[in-house]
């Protein structure tokens, strides 16, 4: 931490190599998510090794897809800087791209391992949103994914800790801590999903992950509107369009599945 109170994004320097807080936080979030998924997976007769293998396959694909998603919607820049398209360490990944990549891997993985897809998605959904909430603190360390400019007075009115206020002071301007808004929303979503999942005869198979989509996309739509660094598509940001589509689709899927399959089993069965 420097004399202005801004946290150094580099946690440890080993010669020419840097270990950044962002990586530490993301890795910790993934480890916690895997641990909790293993515990829940045992209740649903999913082998521990299946969870570990899924992570091994899905993580690199998710990272690649997150980068591709970002580059595609910033093609006006990267079309003139092709050599930078792979420089992921310079920043520029999108969570929705990562989720799309992970879902593709899950669909293939479940088919090959003969695992019920909806069951596996229900198992990991709450831990994914928890990891997302924790991961936003990596953005905090990098002073990125913040919102529009604001005032010191406004930040103080939120009764935020001083270290958060200091970190939101970037190049002479204070910014909205949208990372914090999303982190709190995601962690709250984790709690809600766990409570709902534990209720008997409340959620059908597949409705835990659909509830995750509804919760996350609803919050992301509004929080994304406060961002200044996200990708635009017309009058809305790309993530807002996708959030809107996912929100409506998940609600429709719940009604469609219940209407067309009255024998659909409860998650707790």
Curated annotation (Swiss-Prot):
Localization per Swiss-Prot or TrEMBL: Cell membrane
GO molecular function, one term: phosphatidylglycerol-prolipoprotein diacylglyceryl transferase activity
Protein's name in the database: Phosphatidylglycerol--prolipoprotein diacylglyceryl transferase
The protein's enzyme class: transferase
Similarity remark: Belongs to the Lgt family.
PANTHER family cross-referenced by the UniProt entry: PHOSPHATIDYLGLYCEROL--PROLIPOPROTEIN DIACYLGLYCERYL TRANSFERASE, PROLIPOPROTEIN DIACYLGLYCERYL TRANSFERASE
Listed transmembrane segments: 21-41, 54-74, 88-108, 206-226, 236-256
Species this chain originates from: Ligilactobacillus salivarius (strain UCC118) (Lactobacillus salivarius)
Pfam families: LGT
Recorded superkingdom: Bacteria
Principal subcellular localization: membrane
Protein's GO biological process: lipoprotein biosynthetic process
Pathway participation: Protein modification; lipoprotein biosynthesis (diacylglyceryl transfer)
Known role: Catalyzes the transfer of the diacylglyceryl group from phosphatidylglycerol to the sulfhydryl group of the N-terminal cysteine of a prolipoprotein, the first step in the formation of mature lipoproteins.
């Amino acid at each position: 931490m420097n004399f202005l109170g801004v946290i150094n994004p580099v946690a440890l320097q080993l010669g020419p190599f840097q270990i950044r807080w962002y990586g530490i936080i993301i890795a910790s979030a993934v480890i916690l998510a895997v641990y909790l998924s293993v515990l829940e997976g045992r209740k649903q007769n999913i082998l521990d090794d299946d969870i570990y293998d899924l992570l091994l396959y899905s993580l690199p694909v998710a990272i690649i897809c997150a980068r591709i998603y970002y580059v595609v919607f910033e093609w006006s820049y990267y079309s003139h800087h092709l050599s930078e398209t792979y420089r992921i360490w310079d920043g520029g990944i999108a969570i929705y791209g990562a989720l799309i990549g992970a879902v593709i891997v899950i669909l293939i993985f479940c088919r090959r391992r003969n695992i019920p897809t909806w069951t596996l998605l229900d198992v990991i959904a709450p831990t994914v949103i928890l990891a997302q909430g924790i991961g936003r603190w990596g953005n905090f360390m990098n002073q990125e994914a913040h919102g529009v400019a604001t005032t010191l007075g406004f930040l103080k009115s939120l009764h935020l800790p001083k270290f958060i206020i200091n970190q939101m002071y970037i190049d002479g301007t204070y910014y909205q801590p949208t990372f914090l808004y999303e982190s709190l929303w995601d962690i709250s979503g984790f709690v809600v999903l766990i409570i709902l999942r534990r209720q008997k005869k409340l959620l059908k198979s597949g409705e835990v992950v659909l509830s995750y989509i509804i919760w996350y996309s609803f919050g992301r739509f509004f929080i994304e509107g406060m961002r200044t660094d996200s990708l635009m598509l017309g009058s809305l940001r790309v993530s807002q369009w996708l959030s809107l589509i996912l929100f409506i689709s998940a609600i429709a899927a719940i009604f469609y599945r219940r209407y067309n399959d009255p024998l659909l089993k409860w998650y707790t069965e």
